[in-house]
Amino acid sequence: MGVQRYDSRAGLIVVDFQNDFADPAGSLSVSGGASILPTINAEVAAATANGALVAYTQDWHPESTPHFARDGGIWPVHCVRGTWGAEIHPEQKDDGPRVRKGTNG
């Protein structure tokens, strides 16, 4: 490749690559979601090798929230903090900072 995408002034954000979204057993699983893992890991490696910051977001909900259908929202229970579903997919390289969102519902 002739174009360098990353340097020390760049950043890469990996968004919500968690078990509940990426694993077929997850409560909000995206069909074929884990198939993009090699591409994500390659981008993370390229960014890291070129000095870019790599950060990760993580959906991180309390057990009860108006966000969930059982509590009046529209979404199934997912990414409840401290559960398997909320964990970053085990094959995802995640050595950078994490930003947890949805922490208040």
Give each language-model segment a name.
Residues M1-N104:
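Active-site acidic carboxylates
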